[in-house]
């Protein structure tokens, strides 16, 4: 029997050069997208942190961690949207047991 929903964790890094308003807009966009396709269990904004290595010649990024529950098909779509969104430097989605 197929799973109806599963728990996931998404971490994404936003380019801090977008400024406060730009970062807030990106965070709000993904919050709304996840809420429209599931439920947010936990949302943490870690703020600006030093990157382990340069990404696009930038030493820092704005980190956001979201734990959510959704249908198993949604994370693939979320990952696609992370990849095409300007300002998102890196993202990772994992399944939580």
What are these regions (language model features)?
Residues 2-97:
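Structured, basic alpha/beta domains of bacterial-type, RNA-associated proteins
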